[in-house]
Amino acid sequence: MKKLLLILIVLLPSTTMAQDAQYNISSYLSEGVKAPNTHHIGEAWLNALIEADDDFDQNITQATFSANSTLDWHKHSTPQVLVVLDGVGYYQERDKDAVVIKKGDVVMCEKDTEHWHTSSADNSVSYIAIYGKEPTIWTEKITREYYDSVASKLKGK
């Protein structure tokens, strides 16, 4: 009986791993990897939940930004949907006022619409972004001064 128990203890983890290898399963509970500061200031983590391919042409990525982080102006060749999972952030489209986004909000951004989204000055934010397979088109840096002016206008909202 002890030998059987030992065999089960040894084999069960490998069987479980083999079962997991049969499926494409990811978790939005994972923080992901820290993103290099290429198009943002501050700390950001990206978790590629599903990467677009020939059969499914949408990327689904979880992004988490620490408080007081920026993300540059950008656009996508397809619509983008943001589902805010936790925290408080900002969202703005070009030539429109910035707004506060928070846990539970779902934002739809039309294709080719220049916009940015990130954490608020005092809170981190985590969201799932759903967008097409074409690469993000980065258009303009967000300066610390611009971000701070938006944060000042939205403070307390």
Residue ranges of model-derived segments:
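A short, N-terminal "cap"/entry segment at the start of jelly-roll beta-barrel domains
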Residues: 17-57, 137-140, 144-157
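Glycine- and acidic-residue-biased ligand/ion/polar-headgroup-sensing regions
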Residues: 76-90, 94-95
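Sec-dependent N-terminal signal peptides
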Residues: 4-13
